[in-house]
Amino acid sequence: MRILFMGTPDIAAECLKALYAAGHEICGVYTRRDKPVGRKQVLTAPPVKEVALEHGTPVFQPRTLRDGSEDANIRALAPDLIVVVAYGCILPKSVLEAPKYGCINLHVSLLPKYRGSAPVQWAVLNGDTETGVSIMQMDEGLDTGDVLVCEKIAIGPEETSGELFDRVTAVGARVLCEAVPAMEAGTLKPQPQQHENATLAPMLDKELAEFRLTDTAAHIHNWVRGMNPWPMAWFATAGGKKVKVTECRVAASDGEAPGTVLSTKPLTVACADGAVQLLHVVPEGKKPMDGTSFAAGLRLKAGDTL
């Protein structure tokens, strides 16, 4: 089966590697354009492009597919199937209908839950105990196509989005490689999504990453896990300083007011319904440190307000 692959970030690169390793014929790769990265704004290729070039596969980086400018090229590549993993461009009807087997997409949630760009993060932010991966037959909607395959994945109670994403990537690559031959054999049974149960997983940003010590312990704990590694959960101290929290644990309190320091070893602070241990933090303008060192730097003691 001739596969045209479309994807951009690390998860897509891992899936492309898996397809190569499984012996599939990749007739071409579409990815987003190179972009400036870092403080020096070095023009950097997407991870998928690097993998494709290592295998000598033609790479295409159009600004868009929606204007029809790539239709002729896609037809010339003559793919039997288009595989999409976090490409970042909308596929028009002309592209969706070009291959014999259409287009399939790996989505890292149990559809119809968490449609959108940040499904792994929102599963953690919401305190879910499981998520999964879905292989979907693409249509013109946003993650609305029939589900061909899905597999559940448990979420650890202390697992961060970054840690979970690594596991989801590995499972997704495996499930994708299993789905391709099954699709060719005609053994997959499309299951329409229950659209009335759909939820969205919008992009994260630094403003959304804020929590308050007046929030519940569970909310703070989930926010810290879900916003790690980016954009990192943060709160503002009583003095107005921004503090990122990279690791915390839920703890008990005796009903002290939110923001009250209960202990400095480890740094434990009361919140709405209990307390949280702030184990690792990044104070504004400073390097990462453990919570105890942060407390020492501020000369905090039990009973103070953070």
Name these PLM-found stretches.
Residues R2-L4, E25-Y30, H55-L77, I82, ...:
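Internal alpha/beta domain cores that form substrate/cofactor-binding pockets in large enzymes
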Residues A22, R32, L81-L200:
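Donor/substrate-binding cores of folate-linked one-carbon enzymes
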Residues E178-T237:
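Active-site-lining helix/loop region of Rossmann-like oxidoreductase modules
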Residues L213-L306:
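An anion-binding loop in the catalytic cleft
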Residues M1-R39:
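N-terminal Rossmann-like dinucleotide-binding module
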Residues A13, V42-A45, D67-D71, S117:
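Structural motif corresponding to alpha-helix initiation and N-cap regions
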Residues K35-H55:
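N-terminal beta-loop-helix "entrance" segment that forms/cooperates
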Residues G7, V29, A52, I82, ...:
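A residue-level signal for conserved active-site and pocket-lining positions in enzyme catalytic cores
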